């Protein structure tokens, strides 16, 4: 009997061990698949464009950029450093893969899968680490109702909200991240000493001061004034996408780039049309915004290094900054196009996607120039339309009224107006008429590049709205038999105009309920979208940049 019990116990232990091994193998396979969604891609830049002093500046800025990585990691989740330390110390192969994906995602939450945890079971707080994890919208709003004098600091882009006893308090970034920002400030001042260009030197010194004062206005103005410079850098807290509770709080990032002078000169013509583009918006004149500055420089650059918010998950193609409406009113905004990132994404992602989702006879219209020009017009379109608005007689900003819906609505608007303005450039004779089909078709292929990022993410959600709206209104057709999609060129412009009007009026009126309804109705994973996305499983979702400077 005793022998039988021993044998049964051993069989039970063996069975449990086998199951555990199978589960572990499945976990390893799953993690490797997640990592393989991002194609490792070397990002090089032309060293010959830099003189010896500029090379020193770039190296210093690279050191400062790495601090932005650490700051953003802290902003994403309160336990990020603890988790990373545990994974770094582990010798378990599963933890090694988990760490690799953690580094891509800047935390244990899968940005491609609605922020579901891939390590541990805790859900990601909507407010990331900008607010107490248990803070609700209701509690935040009630606090402001009872403490109206706190509104400005609590809704500031550059404060974190913390509990102190039974109270809530807004802590400036300069205090909350004092150690890191003091170090970054020092490095920027060191870099400024080697900067030959006076405008770059001025920006670096003012941005260094801003890290300590928490006032970024003067340094944003100085960034807009950069002139005849080779090094194009932006560093600090900018985008609010990570704050899904209110879209109030700015995340730290850095774009370290060098200017491509020949390509930049080619695009100078477009900035002359900004006022005309505003006039051409499909909304009543009373809602058009002619008070923004019109300097609006456009730069084509090679990215040397990206850090923080811009590097988490999906890589940025271009940016349009600053976001401060006061700076935009005075000077406009700067559009910066990352050409080497565009080239990598077109080759590895966009064209292979087009081959799988588009009707074969429309594939001929997918071109790199249409892809690049759409990104340009997308960024220019961020600077168009309502900014400061009046709601119930009170002056406010679109982003404050639309709250957590703002990022998705704004990205959707920029993509819709990106097409609208490319078509306008045909009317103005800047582009030839034969580019029209390229504009429509290349964008449609690009929709499926974006929605793979997850429709809970601002760009993916914005593109889902466009796809479903255009499909439902006859601008796109889905062929069930071939499982492909196509543009109905004769219907597309009218449908585009209607959606542009709806988005712009939501912004002009600060219509929070209208924004929520549009997102609920159209930012959905519709049947045809599911089928088409399923076909793309054999392709990477994005690139995983291996920056030459970081090797």
Regions found by a protein language model. Give the residues of each.
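Fold-level signature of zinc-dependent metallopeptidase catalytic domains
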Residues: 31-59, 151-408, 412-415, 420-424, ...
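Long, well-structured alpha-helical subdomains associated
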Residues: 419-516
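Sec-dependent N-terminal signal peptides
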Residues: 6-8
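Positively charged n-region of N-terminal signal peptides that target proteins for export
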Residues: 1-4
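N-terminal helix-rich structural modules
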Residues: 23-195, 199-203
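C-terminal motif of bacterial Sec signal peptides marking the signal peptidase cleavage site
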Residues: 12-15
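Extended, compositionally biased alpha-helical segments that mediate assembly or anchoring
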Residues: 492, 496, 500-551
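Bacterial signal peptide processing site
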Residues: 17-19
């Amino acid at each position: 009997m005793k022998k039988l019990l021993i044998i049964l116990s051993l069989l039970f232990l063996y069975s449990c061990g086998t199951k555990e091994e199978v589960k572990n193998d499945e976990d390893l396979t799953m993690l490797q698949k997640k990592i393989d969604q991002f194609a490792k891609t070397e990002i090089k830049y032309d060293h010959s464009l830099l003189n010896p002093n500029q090379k020193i500046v770039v190296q210093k800025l690279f050191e400062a950029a790495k601090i932005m990585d650490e700051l953003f990691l802290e902003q994403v989740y309160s336990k990020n450093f603890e988790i990373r330390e545990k994974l770094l110390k582990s010798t378990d192969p599963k933890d090694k893969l988990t760490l690799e994906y953690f580094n891509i995602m800047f935390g244990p939450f899968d940005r491609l899968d609605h922020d579901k945890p891939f390590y541990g079971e805790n859900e990601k707080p909507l407010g990331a680490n900008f607010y107490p994890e248990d803070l609700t919208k209701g509690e935040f709003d009630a606090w402001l109702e009872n403490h109206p004098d706190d509104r400005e600091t609590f809704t500031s882009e550059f404060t974190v909200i913390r509990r102190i006893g039974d109270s809530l308090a807004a802590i400036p970034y300069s205090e909350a991240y004092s150690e890191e920002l003091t170090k970054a400030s020092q490095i920027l001042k060191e870099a400024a000493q080697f900067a030959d260009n006076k405008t770059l030197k001025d920006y670096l010194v003012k941005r260094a001061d801003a890290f300590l004062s928490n006032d970024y206005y003067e340094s944003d103005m100085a960034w807009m004034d950069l002139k005849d410079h080779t090094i194009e850098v932006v560093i600090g807290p900018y985008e609010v996408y990570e704050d899904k509770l209110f879209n109030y709080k700015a995340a730290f990032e850095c774009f370290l780039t060098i200017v491509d002078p020949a390509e930049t000169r080619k695009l100078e013509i477009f900035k002359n049309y900004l006022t005309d583009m505003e006039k051409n918006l499909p909304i009543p004149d009373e809602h058009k915004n002619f008070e923004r500055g019109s300097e609006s420089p456009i730069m084509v650059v090679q990215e040397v290094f990206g850090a923080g918010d811009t590097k988490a998950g999906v890589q940025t193609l271009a940016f349009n900054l600053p976001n401060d409406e006061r700076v935009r009113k005075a000077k406009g905004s700067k559009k910066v196009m990352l050409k080497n990132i565009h080239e990598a994404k077109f080759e590895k992602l966009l064209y292979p996607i087009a081959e799988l989702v588009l009707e074969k006879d429309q594939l001929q219209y997918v071109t790199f120039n249409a892809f690049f020009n759409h990104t340009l017009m997308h960024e220019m379109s961020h600077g168009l339309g309502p900014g400061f608005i009046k709601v119930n007689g009170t002056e406010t900003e679109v982003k404050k009224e639309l709250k957590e819906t703002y990022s998705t609505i704004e990205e959707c608007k920029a993509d819709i107006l990106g097409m609208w303005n490319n078509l306008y450039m045909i009317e103005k004779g800047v582009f030839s008429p034969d580019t029209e089909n390229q504009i429509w078709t290349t964008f449609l292929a690009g929709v499926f590049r974006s929605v793979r990022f997850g429709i809970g993410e601002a760009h993916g959600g914005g593109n889902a709205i466009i796809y479903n709206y255009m499909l439902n209104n006859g601008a796109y057709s889905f062929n069930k038999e071939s499982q492909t999609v196509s543009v109905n060129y004769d219907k597309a412009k009218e449908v585009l105009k209607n959606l542009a009007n709806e988005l712009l009026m939501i912004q002009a009126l600060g219509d929070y309920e209208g924004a929520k309804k549009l997102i609920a109705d159209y930012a959905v994973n519709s049947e045809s979208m599911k089928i088409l996305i399923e076909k793309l499983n054999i392709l990477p979702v994005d690139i995983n940049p291996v920056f030459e400077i970081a090797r």
